[in-house]
Amino acid sequence: MNLFTDFEVRIKNALEQIDIVREKRSELDFGRIGVEPPRDASHGDVATNAAMVLSKPLGMNPRALAEIIIAKLQEDADVADVSAAGPGFINIRLSVGYWQRLLATMISEGEKFGRSTVGAGQKVNVEYVSANPTGPMHVGHCRGAVVGDALANLLGFAGYDVTKEYYINDAGSQIDVLARSVFIRYREALGEQVGEIPAGLYPGDYLVPVGESLAKEFGTKLRGMPEEQWLPIIRERAIDAMMVMIRADLEALNVHHDVFFSERTLHANGAALIRTAINDLTFKGYVYKGALPPPKGQLPEDWEDREQTLFRSTEVGDDIDRPLIKSDGSYTYFAADVAYFKNKFDRGFNEMIYILGADHGGYVKRLEAVARGVSEGKAKLTVLLCQLVKLFRNGEPVKMSKRSGDFVTLREVVDEVGRDSVRFMMLYRKSSEPLDFDFAKVTEQSKDNPVFYVQYAHARCMSIFRQAQEAFPDLDIASLDLAKAVGGVISDPAELQLVAKIAEFPRIIEAAAQAQEPHRIAFYLYDLASSFHGHWNKGKDLPELRFVNDKNRELSIARLGLVHAVASVLKSGLGITGTAAPDEMR
């Protein structure tokens, strides 16, 4: 239950009872009415701009209209107090009874509390990671992996039908470079002294096992073949080996995909899917033959000073038209992008989200143009760019990895600090902002370490249940009707403040899903944990506020209901971030 949605309905119903509003209803835009928490919690529980929004079309002073609305809202039994502020904002304070009923609902719904139908089952494709299958995942992939996975989890929680997808870039020239790199490791496994890995190839030790596997399978057979024979053989096995490694890296980070889509699929059967996509754009009038003027600055890889087959992407929002077929008849990488988008669109996705690194910023306009051209405006494509992650240890930059050759691997980071720390911290800053990740900071057991602070809140909730069992040995906690127990008992202002913080969860879910910003969940969880820890600490000085009071069984049981609600939301939120909710922490 979203209390802000509930009161939006109540406020609009109150407006419908005002004569002048009814008379001019067709001229009023109720969609502009906002209902949200006041900026200052001391002003109330719910605030609305209704009077500000409607005063002009009604020809009234906002403050005067606010007073009329207030009179109607005062008739609501769940409104304890309502007042106007500033030029016409309305602040509402809710009754204790309303909070108690809402808490009972939270307890009854458990981990379902906060789930939304705002997505209405709409199909959404979220593509993330999509790292080249040329080596282990590095820390640069880590942020996009976590952001994409958490966003997909969030959208699913908000009622969207989500597909998590990984695009395997296995058709480009980098795959031939990989195969040649593996061939050197294969020769090395046969006993050759290969010396230093040539420039332009992948030097990492991670290719050694692949070379050894080939030596076991083929012996010296491949060594005697010309490159055109051994290259496709090694290419296939190298891709498979790299994807096994990448999948293991993703699993270590608790990142999952529903679909792994191979770029080679687009090039199969004479590049049938690419040809179909280009034919479709041709039919729609977006394809022509021509030569592009040389762009300013550095020339892109696909630019040629001769006639090519071009996508008229400037007609759909791009800066320049894009080559689809080169003068030699070969397809550009961009042509595969077009075919891949069309494939997703043909699979029924009208909303697609691409999670890319900040270095792909130049791709945004062209991808958006593809979406408009292929779908004729029927599909929405959003590109979310993740800024760089810099690694530190006690404030000092972390050195590169010997195993990978020139970068820090994702597995190294996860093995050192744990996947929960990695995942939560990758979400503890907006993805469009750079992130500094300090190994020392993320392993601290303090309030300054967000993942510890939030997980400790859940563990503390569980410890309170164990404490209650010790205080009341005959109590069968598992069979308690905690939702019923809170009625008429939970009433202390400090307790109600905690209930109010829990009650924000459904609104946070919907807002974060609609903004496609999973970091909002991490921020909210920290705030909830802070409120909970703060209330727990008050109990150390004020025994009457302790969650378990061995002299008051009824109150203790009711407060277990409050703890249950906190724990449920923490667990749900941590689940969205892909982070564990431990029952104990040592």
From Swiss-Prot:
Primary site of residence: cytoplasm
Alphabetical UniProt keywords: Aminoacyl-tRNA synthetase, ATP-binding, Cytoplasm, Ligase, Nucleotide-binding, Protein biosynthesis
SUPFAM superfamilies referenced in this protein's UniProt entry, alphabetically: Anticodon-binding domain of a subclass of class I aminoacyl-tRNA synthetases, Arginyl-tRNA synthetase (ArgRS), N-terminal 'additional' domain, Nucleotidylyl transferase
GO MF annotation list: arginine-tRNA ligase activity; ATP binding
Record EC number: 6.1.1.19
PROSITE patterns assigned to the protein according to its UniProt record, in alphabetical order: AA_TRNA_LIGASE_I
UniProt enzyme class: ligase
GO cellular component: cytoplasm
Keyword Oxidoreductase: no
Domain of life: Bacteria
GO biological process: arginyl-tRNA aminoacylation
Catalysis performed (reactions): tRNA(Arg) + L-arginine + ATP = L-arginyl-tRNA(Arg) + AMP + diphosphate
A Pfam entry, by short name: Arg_tRNA_synt_N
Subunit structure: Monomer.
NCBIfam families in the cross-refs: argS
UniProt similarity note: Belongs to the class-I aminoacyl-tRNA synthetase family.
Protein name: Arginine--tRNA ligase
Gene: argS
